[in-house]
Amino acid sequence: MRTKLLELVEKDQIRTDLPEIREGYNVKVHVRIKEGNKERIQVFEGLVIASYGTGINKSITVRKDSYGVGVERIFKLNSPLIAHIEVTRINKVRRAKLYYMRDLKGKSARLKEIKKAK
């Protein structure tokens, strides 16, 4: 249950520079990595298989295959560590959670593209 006071406070804190992100989108998440006193940007590109939360607590799970090994990472969308997010492809899906993609490999892991992202 969300109170009106909580929504009022969150409205000022929430990021508005991010695009709409849903399950089935292929995204590039640009993450700030701090190593010692240096900071760099690392890109994590993959498929959004789940999203949870609302408002300031919204987060997404992004999955990619790296050298034959599946890698999943959870991102809080309002984190200051996220520089920006690009939507690279919009796929047609009929589920809210795409956990079945974990078991699929090769051609069976393809999704039908709806349209190119801008």
Curated annotation (Swiss-Prot):
GO cellular component: cytosolic large ribosomal subunit
GO biological process, one term: translation
Coiled coil (residue ranges): none
Record GO terms (molecular function): structural constituent of ribosome
Function: This protein is located at the 30S-50S ribosomal subunit interface and may play a role in the structure and function of the aminoacyl-tRNA binding site.
Family to which this protein belongs: Belongs to the bacterial ribosomal protein bL19 family.
Protein name: Large ribosomal subunit protein bL19
Organism: Metamycoplasma arthritidis (strain 158L3-1) (Mycoplasma arthritidis)
Originating gene: rplS
